[in-house]
């Protein structure tokens, strides 16, 4: 398994296993099977509500903590103890301590050893700078090995300089053959920020494959030429760009 060396020297497996929308009754078996197939990077988040289940599954499978890389994310949803509806209220003025509490909750959920490998700001919410500042604090305490962002554009990343001297280790965002994101990829790589692809084969909040990619005539013709599946061709395209999958 190839590793990507992040800008602080931490090694991150290039191939990861996403845990979003895995049914609860199939979750543990899916995690164990993924591990047996060779996956060593697992991606979760507070809003997936499976952080505890992820650690439990890996422990039950007799996996050693040092043998896996775990990513989680802090999301605006975590700042409320009641259902959160997007656009329901202005959220710029969330207290900083509330954000710290949300991060602490994820750290407790993933308490296995004394660290989380990678912690991302899940989206550039109005309070994203407070979120990153809080992650900076936990990173410097040694409780997080690397911090980063998700779905951030250059202006968001540049703004982080106001609250932290830590350049994000990773920016996770949608990349696909129909949304190549060449400019954003170049920006991140020029800044030493590793790029991680998400939503390459499925739309947000859906497990259904994107037929416009799977059945794309150009991708299919390349797949036929090399006797591979369209999925394999797309994964190879990402892999050769040094993108985390």
Where are these regions (language model features)?
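Beta/alpha (TIM)-barrel catalytic core signal, keyed to glycine-rich beta->alpha loops juxtaposed to Asp/Glu
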Residues: 107, 123-245
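Short loop/turn motifs at secondary-structure junctions
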Residues: 11, 38-41, 64, 111-115, ...
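Conserved, mostly hydrophobic/aromatic
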Residues: 17, 34, 42, 54, ...
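A short, structured active-site edge motif that brings together acidic residues
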Residues: 66-80, 118-122, 151
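N-terminal binding-site loop/beta-alpha segment at the start of enzyme catalytic domains
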Residues: 1-68, 72, 78, 201-205
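Surface-exposed, active-site-proximal loop segments in enzymatic domains
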Residues: 79-93
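Acidic (Asp/Glu)-rich catalytic clusters
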Residues: 6-7, 33-35, 55-69, 106-114, ...
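Short, acidic/polar
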Residues: 22-35, 92-111, 130, 155-158, ...
């Amino acid at each position: 398994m190839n590793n990507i060396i992040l800008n602080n020297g931490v090694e991150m497996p290039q191939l990861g296993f996403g845990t979003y929308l895995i049914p609860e009754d199939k979750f543990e078996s899916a995690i164990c099977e993924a591990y047996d197939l060779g996956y060593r990077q697992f991606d979760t988040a507070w809003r997936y509500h499976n952080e505890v289940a992820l650690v439990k599954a890996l422990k039950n499978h007799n996996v050693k903590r040092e043998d896996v890389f775990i990513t989680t994310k802090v999301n605006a949803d975590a700042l409320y103890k009641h259902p959160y509806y997007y656009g329901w209220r202005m959220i710029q003025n969330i207290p900083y301590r509330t954000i710290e509490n949300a991060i602490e909750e994820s750290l407790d959920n993933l308490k296995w050893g004394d660290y989380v490998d990678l912690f991302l700001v899940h989206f550039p919410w109005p309070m994203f700078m407070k979120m990153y500042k809080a992650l900076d604090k936990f990173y410097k305490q040694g409780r997080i090995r690397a911090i980063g962002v998700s779905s951030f554009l250059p202006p968001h990343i540049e703004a982080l300089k106001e609250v932290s001297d830590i350049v994000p280790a990773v920016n996770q965002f949608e990349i696909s053959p129909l949304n190549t994101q060449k400019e954003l990829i170049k920006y991140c790589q020029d800044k030493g920020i590793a790029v991680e692809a998400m939503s390459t084969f499925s739309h947000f909040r859906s497990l259904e494959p994107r037929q416009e990619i799977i059945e794309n005539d150009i991708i299919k013709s390349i797949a036929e030429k090399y006797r591979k599946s369209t999925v394999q061709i797309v994964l190879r395209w990402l892999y050769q760009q040094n993108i985390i999958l």
